[in-house]
């Protein structure tokens, strides 16, 4: 009973600390970003998962290497004025565009629409961490928002996912304020569905 009361008090505090999010209902990017941020908040603050930045770090690494090529080109051209610097400049330009191509492939096939990777630590510290991913989509001039949640078992490496698609009007009132309690129910349902499947297998 005490454990249950403790859990309820944590959830209650999480709801009390929640501040209303108000956006322009006609701004699709703002709508999507606010829903994404709210879903992220549920996994991190309600369930206590730790955000992993490996996916973002990969993109930053590619961008950093691309910038290094441009810096090398500038320095080399300063030290060895054109046309002496022509071979190095050509090499840097080609390398830069190759890195941009790699970045495009990375964002398209690796990142996709993922905006959160969260790790669920094993309480005993014996098994590998479980991974939870959130991705979403909201087409331009469309009100149908899709939230996908995937779970990867750290031990078996098996993955499962589930999703919902709802009109954004379900989660915002007439003033453009996010109804967090309503949205939380949908996000928590996705999580609990995957968590239940995890326990039964």
From Swiss-Prot:
Component of the signal peptidase complex (SPC) composed of a catalytic subunit sec11a and three accessory subunits spcs1, spcs2 and spcs3. The complex induces a local thinning of the ER membrane which is used to measure the length of the signal peptide (SP) h-region of protein substrates. This ensures the selectivity of the complex towards h-regions shorter than 18-20 amino acids. It is a multi-pass membrane protein. The keyword Endoplasmic reticulum applies. The keyword Transmembrane applies. Residues 1-59, 108-201 are cytoplasmic. It comes from Danio rerio (Zebrafish). Signal peptide: none annotated. PANTHER family: MICROSOMAL SIGNAL PEPTIDASE 25 KDA SUBUNIT, SIGNAL PEPTIDASE COMPLEX SUBUNIT 2. It is found in: Endoplasmic reticulum membrane. The chain crosses the membrane at residues 60-80, 87-107. Component of the signal peptidase complex (SPC) which catalyzes the cleavage of N-terminal signal sequences from nascent proteins as they are translocated into the lumen of the endoplasmic reticulum. Enhances the enzymatic activity of SPC and facilitates the interactions between different components of the translocation site. Keywords: Endoplasmic reticulum, Membrane, Transmembrane, Transmembrane helix. GO terms for cellular component: signal peptidase complex. Pfam families: SPC25. InterPro entries: Spc2/SPCS2. This is Signal peptidase complex subunit 2. Belongs to the SPCS2 family. Disulfide bonds: none annotated. Residues 81-86 are lumenal.
